[in-house]
A protein has these predicted regions:
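Disordered, acidic Ser/Thr/Pro-rich linker "stalks" and the adjacent N-terminal cap
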Residues: 36, 96-102, 617, 718-772, ...
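Short glycine/acidic-rich loop motifs that flank beta-strands on beta-rich extracellular proteins
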Residues: 36-37, 260, 271-274, 286-287, ...
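Juxtadomain low-complexity/linker regions and immediately adjacent membrane-anchoring helices
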Residues: 52-81, 219-230, 712, 716-746, ...
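Extracytoplasmic
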Residues: 52-224
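Acidic Gly/Asp/Thr-rich repetitive segments characteristic of extracellular carbohydrate-active
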Residues: 231-265
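Extracellular beta-strand-rich solenoid/capping regions of secreted or surface-exposed proteins
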Residues: 249, 253-254, 269-283, 291-339, ...
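Right-handed parallel beta-helix
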Residues: 285-288, 306-317, 337-348, 359-375, ...
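Feature for long, exposed domains in two main contexts
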Residues: 615-720
Length: 840
């Protein structure tokens, strides 16, 4: 049925000096399909933008194999993968760019009032921490909605502790744009709950940049343990209004005298000057409950006997700018022999832990370190047999974790199962000297200028310095989007860097094995003497590493030396060969790679003597990028349409699956792999079993970047009641005022077309159905108002396949419209009628 409504003005309405003899028509159009016909899909309503599938470099630091990285008590949600009405920024690797410092190199900006990011919980949560950025100098609130209801509490945000300028960096020297703010809901929300961060009219710190939100299910506050002395019993103020420094000192002294521990109840405590603690066990109610406001909690300026054990509280600082000339670090100095730190939260201090003067047989675990101005944790000499494990470290202004053998050696240090993301300067993990240290099963993501994922280095900074010696074990680490341009060198640093900066690797064996290097913007492994003195890098063994998606080469050697390499498999390598050019000797091939078995997907030839431009390997491409099958009758099958899948990369892409969803089927020629520079075809057909708009997805899963490659599929299943004319183009011989031809096909019976007053007959209205279709009947509608009295109209119906030559389908006849039956008339068309253009 092609539904067209013949309309006239209601009786009694006659414009002055005008005849009322106008042909009014076609408020809505419906075509009943007979046989195989095409139909019109109903337009979907406007909704908030949902982020599309992220680019290949958006691999999450949390989607890694079990046993790798920290086991963390939160679920992280990327803003770009949530629903949002703001602006997506990134991806980017440009120094000094907001997107570059974001997790996954993407974030969402709220640039106007009313814009939001909305997260849907996949597990229960009662608290969250949002990683955000504001313009420099800005502070303000951000509204929080749960299931559409605004909370009375707002997030209080500031840029005061962000934006560090490091003048020693060439180019853009400002970094650390982001900070963190956390909130407890006061109740637990279950999976499926929506949490929206929205810039309301009272939230004036625009633009808000939202990177990620970490949702926690925080356990209840702990109660005071036996044999402990509470700081409040010594006069500490849990409201944070009064200074509690003296009360803490007195509690520590009293606890030591009694052989008991120190208890910090829930509350906020102001500490105005650092504590000196020889030995103590200090316990809080939990890092979301016991909060200490200070930039420096403990400062032991010489070795202590220890142990100084710390657990279950937060140190929340307010450090503005980096302070290398002071000891303003959350935990500074010595904590002694055998100490344990467990379950702290440290934020907005200069450094999290700066451990020096003497620390041994110690453990730092289950701790969050965020938004420090310099290192997260640094063993600054005199540390032995200490383990740092299962910690989450984000947004440091320098190395995430570091071993620095100044003024004496660090030895037997283990960094294991930590997750380190977004160090905004320097490395995720660095071992500067020392002996027999281990770096295992960590995750490092998104390093910035001067930063590798992992650096094994003889850079001394100061003397006396103890170079690397013994065996340095680096195993099972996952490095994601690590390595960066070094603006001071003018060339990139690798995801992994072996750096004979101030002395050669001569008395050390470095075993690098297992794990993966994923999505590095530049090279995977770098061998360099960063001072430019050409010291050799020897004793390096690399084995069984998975490398995927590099901007340049697997190996970049800038000095002399020897490395043994086996079992390194690579795909998506941006540039063929290896950079191998010794400096300052300017000798091609100065570095020797002894290649064992199991290497694939890369080569040490050709030898490159100029730093290659990154050719970030492209994802597979699909042409066309979407398929539209139009209208297909329910129970029928469309003709096949073809998608060409091309591989622009430098290596073959293995194909794990080709699939379609919805009422679609496919056949393909892709086989088990697509050769470098090659292509395959996928033929798709549409076979609806019901009416309406029916979508699907063609998905090609491969080893290439951005897998799976997806192609959107759309079509409409047509049944006998399908409205073919809805939304289609309508034209008329004339129109009066706002009563235009498009009113015929808008689906609204209260709007209509009316011809120009006094225009001669015949007046026509024509609908273009988009293609030749089989049509069974035509329905005409007047507005249903009873003001439109019963009347009979005389009409004829014509059809055309080309819009030029029309033939009569139904001769002139009278059709009665009665308000009591909906003011509708139906015209049956001859069996077998086909037309693209239908004219009344």
């Amino acid at each position: 049925m092609l539904a067209m409504s013949l309309l006239r003005r209601p009786p009694g309405w006659v414009p002055a000096a005008r005849s009322w003899k106008r042909l009014a028509a076609l408020a809505a159009a419906l075509v009943t399909a007979l046989g195989t016909v095409l139909a019109i899909a109903v337009a979907t309503p406007t909704i908030a933008q949902a982020a599309t599938a992220p680019p290949y470099w958006a691999q999450s630091p949390f989607s890694v194999p079990g046993g790798t990285g920290a086991s963390l008590p939160f679920t992280e949600y990327e803003a770009e993968n949530a629903s949002y009405t703001g602006k997506l920024i990134g991806p980017d690797f440009t120094q000094g760019d907001l997107a570059t410092e974001a997790s996954g190199r993407e974030a969402v900006q709220l640039t106007a009032t009313g814009q939001y990011v909305q997260f849907t919980l996949t597990s229960a949560a009662n608290a969250f921490d949002v990683h955000y950025a504001l313009p420099q100098g800005a502070s303000g609130t951000l509204s929080v909605y749960v299931n559409g209801t605004k909370l009375s509490n707002e997030l209080s945000l500031t840029s005061a502790y962000s934006y560090i300028t490091t003048s020693s960096i060439l180019g853009s020297d400002t970094h650390k744009f982001y900070d963190d703010a956390r909130m407890m809901f006061g109740q637990t929300y279950q999976a499926g709950t929506t949490v929206r961060l929205e810039a309301d009219s009272s939230d004036t710190a625009l633009p808000y940049t939202i990177d990620v939100a970490d949702f926690y299910d925080v356990p209840a506050a702990a109660t005071q343990p036996a044999n402990s002395i509470s700081v409040t019993s010594e006069g500490a103020d849990p409201t944070g209004a009064a200074d509690s420094t003296t009360a803490f000192r007195n509690a520590i002294s009293a606890a030591n005298s009694a052989g008991e521990s120190v208890w910090i109840p829930s509350g906020t405590y102001l500490i105005s000057s650092a504590l000196q603690v020889n030995s103590a066990t200090i316990i809080g109610a939990g890092d979301w409950y016991s909060q200490i406001k200070t930039n420096e909690f403990i400062d032991n300026t010489s070795a202590v006997s220890g142990p100084v054990n710390l657990s279950g509280f937060a140190i929340l600082g307010s450090t503005v700018g980096r302070h290398d000339d002071s000891t303003a670090n959350a935990i500074d100095g010595s904590l002694g022999n055998g100490f344990t730190v467990n379950g702290l939260w440290i934020q907005d201090t200069n450094v999290g832990f700066w451990l020096q003067y003497g620390n041994s047989n110690c453990t730092v675990e289950n701790t969050v370190i965020e938004s420090t101005d310099a290192d997260g944790l640094n063993f600054n000499g005199n540390a032995t047999n200490c383990t740092v494990k299962n910690n989450f470290i984000r947004n440091t202004g320098d190395d995430g974790l570091a071993i620095w053998s100044y003024p004496s050696a660090d030895s037997g240090i283990t960094f294991a199962n930590n997750t380190i993301v977004q160090p905004t300067l320097a490395n995720g993990i660095a071992d500067y000297g020392g002996s027999n240290n281990t770096i295992s099963n960590n995750v490092v993501a998104d390093t910035e200028p001067l930063g590798s994922g992992i650096a094994i280095s003889n850079e001394q900074f100061l003397s006396p310095f103890t170079p690397l010696s013994g065996t340095i074990t680096v195993s099972g680490n996952y490095l994601i989007r690590t390595g960066a341009m070094n603006p001071n060198w003018g060339h990139p640093m690798g995801a992994v860097r072996f750096d004979a900066y101030d002395s050669a690797f001569s008395n050390v064996t470095v075993n690098y094995s297992g794990g993966a290097i994923l999505d590095s913007p530049y090279e995977a492994f770098e061998f360099v003497s960063g001072s430019g003195n050409g010291y050799a890098v020897n004793g390096v063994n690399i084995s069984n590493v998975n490398v995927q998606n590099l901007g340049t080469v697997v190996m970049q050697a800038e000095t002399s030396g020897t490395a043994n390499v086996s079992g390194v498999t690579a795909s998506g390598v941006g540039v063929s060969g290896a950079y191998n050019y010794g400096y300052p000797s300017n000798t091609a091939g100065a570095y020797t790679f002894n290649l064992g078995s199991g290497n694939s997907g890369w080569s040490t030839t050709p030898v490159l003597t100029a730093f290659p431009n990154p050719a970030q390997p492209g994802s597979l491409t699909a042409s066309p990028s979407s398929l539209s099958f139009g209208d297909v009758a329910s129970g029928a099958k469309s003709a096949a349409q073809t998608v060409t899948v091309s591989n622009p990369g430098g290596s073959a892409a293995s194909v794990s699956s080709v699939s379609v969803s919805g009422p679609y089927s496919q056949t393909n020629t892709c086989g088990s792999s697509i050769a470098a520079g090659g292509s395959c075809t996928v033929s798709v057909t549409f076979a609806p079993t019901s009416g309406g708009s029916l979508t699907g997805t063609l998905s090609v899963a491969t080893s290439a970047p951005g897998s799976p490659l997806t192609v959107a599929l759309s079509g409409t299943g047509v049944t006998a009641t399908t409205n073919l004319a809805l939304g289609q183009l309508a034209t008329a011989s004339s129109s009066y005022e706002t009563y235009v031809a498009s009113n015929v096909t808008d689906g609204n019976t209260s709007t209509y077309w009316e011809s120009t007053d006094g225009a001669g007959y015949p007046q026509t209205i024509t609908v273009d159905l988009g293609s030749v279709q089989s049509i069974g009947s035509l329905t005409l509608d007047l507005p249903p108002s009873s003001a439109w009295a019963t009347r009979t109209e005389t009409l004829s119906v014509l059809g055309s396949t080309n819009g030029t030559t029309f033939s009569q389908l139904v001769g002139s006849a009278g059709y009665t419209f009665n308000p009591s039956t909906g003011n509708t008339a139906t015209i049956s068309l001859p069996s077998g009628t086909t037309a693209r253009y239908v004219q009344l």
